[in-house]
Amino acid sequence: MTEAVAAEATETAPATDDRRGGRRGERGDRGQGRGDRGGRGGRDGGREAEKSQFVERVVTINRVAKVVKGGRRFSFTALVVVGDGNGMVGVGYGKAKEVPAAIAKGVEEAKKSFFRVPRVGSTIPHRVQGEAAAGVVLLRPASAGTGVIAGGPVRAVLECVGIHDILSKSLGSSNAINIVHATVAALKQLEEPASVAARRGLPLDEVAPAALVRALQNQKAGV
C-alpha cells in the first residue's frame, strides 16, 4: 500500500513542475511582448525627429514680475530663434510660469514666423542694415573661410539661417531683443541678384560683381 502511494506521488510531481514551468514561460513571453511595444520611446520618436529638423537657439531668458493685490507673481520670458539651417528662420517670444514652458512657447511662435533668406553659397548677396527700436545691425558678405564674425544674438540668428561666412556689427542698443529683431529686419531686406537685374532690365553681370556672378554660377552647378 505504501509503495503504491509513493509511486503515484512520483508520477504526479513532474506534472506539477511542468505546470509551474509553463506559467513562468508564459510570464516571460508577456515580458517580451511588453518590450516589443517600446513604451514611451515609441510615442516620442516623432517629436525627436521633428526637433532634429530644426536648429534652436535660446537667446535670452528673463524673470518678470506682475504686482497684484496679494503680492508679486513671477514668470519667465524666453527669446528663441529657430531655423532649418538652409535659409529658413523665425523668431519667437514665449512667456510662462516655468522656463521649459516659456521656451516651448517661443519655439512654436518662431515656427509660425518663418521666412526665407536669400543666400549665395555660404554668405549673403549684398550689404544690408536693419533697425528695430534702438537696435541697429550691419551685415556684410564675406569670402569663404571667414566664418561668422558676430556677437551672441546676431550669431544665433545667422547660425539658424545657415550662413557660415559673414561680417556683422551692432551699432545701436545692446538689448538682445532689439539686436535680434534688427538682424531679422536686415535679413528681410536681402534680394536675389537675379530679381534685382530683372527689375532693372539689365543683365546680371552689370548688376552684380564678377565674384558674385561666379559664386551664383557655382551654386547652380552644385559646386
Curated annotation (Swiss-Prot):
UniProt keyword Ribosomal protein present: yes
Domain S5 DRBM: 54-117
Gene Ontology biological process terms in this record: translation
Biased composition (Basic and acidic residues): 16-51
Stretches the record annotates as Disordered: 1-51
Keywords: Ribonucleoprotein, Ribosomal protein, RNA-binding, rRNA-binding
PROSITE patterns xref list: RIBOSOMAL_S5, S5_DSRBD
Domain of life from the UniProt record: Bacteria
Biological role: With S4 and S12 plays an important role in translational accuracy. Located at the back of the 30S subunit body where it stabilizes the conformation of the head with respect to the body.
Family as reported in the entry's similarity comment: Belongs to the universal ribosomal protein uS5 family.
Protein name: Small ribosomal subunit protein uS5
Organism this protein belongs to: Paenarthrobacter aurescens (strain TC1)
